[in-house]
Amino acid sequence: MVEKKSPAEGWPVVNGDYIVGDPESPVAATTLASHIEDIPVEAGAAIAGPCKTENLGIEKMIANLISNPNIRFLILCGSEVQGHITGQSIEALHQNGVDPDKRNIIGATGAIPYIENIPDEGIERFQKQLEIVNLIDVEDADAIKAKVKECIEKDPGAFEEEAMIIKVEEGGEEEEGEEVKPVAPETALIEARMRNIQTQVKMIGSTNRMFAGMYSGKVQGIMIGLAFTLTLGILLLV
């Protein structure tokens, strides 16, 4: 039988719109924009609930996950959150972390993907403790339950370190308490395209500098060749 540990006292440590199951289960699920949190819990998940924003919403989720070392799998299921692109932001955070200065999630395509209330050690713990299971845009109950049970069968046991407790400013319900304005899908798409354009401009600039250097080298070579030819011609005439 795999080893289990006690979650933080009073777990879950952050209030939210979720359902709690067996705290010793190795599985947690975020249902993103969908309210189907009962499905994972019925299949044996420790906790399940929506996560609608790519900043404070993710921070609250992480605080509840790393404060229970028994949770080793995070299933991303339900409809992706339009504009915020929360599911993809969670994957990017787990894979890439955040920029140490700007605190933005590296590689996230959401509108405001910033993690300001979770320190680096909390993000690192999230990355090490959890394995991400991608079922984004899947709402089929049978598929979700099957994946929960599959993860339970692969339970590696509790994470080697004890529960990590991080305080996150709650500010009420996620939809109302976060200082995040709803972002239309069109706006998020424009912002994502702007970021892509900026990247392409930087690449073009680098390419231009490279070709400029090559051109400068060619001109320099031609001038040296002409000077050598003229010098040789003068010497022959003399």
Curated annotation (Swiss-Prot):
Q: Where in the cell is it found?
A: Cell membrane
Topology, Extracellular side? 238
Task: Quote the record's cofactor note.
Answer: Binds 1 5-hydroxybenzimidazolylcobamide group.
Q: Which GO terms describe its molecular function?
A: cobalt ion binding; tetrahydromethanopterin S-methyltransferase activity
Catalytic activities: 5-methyl-5,6,7,8-tetrahydromethanopterin + coenzyme M + 2 Na(+)(in) = 5,6,7,8-tetrahydromethanopterin + methyl-coenzyme M + 2 Na(+)(out)
> What does the record give as EC number?
7.2.1.4
Q: Which HAMAP family does this entry report, sorted A to Z?
A: MtrA (MF_01093)
What name does this protein carry? Tetrahydromethanopterin S-methyltransferase subunit A 1
Gene name per UniProt: mtrA1
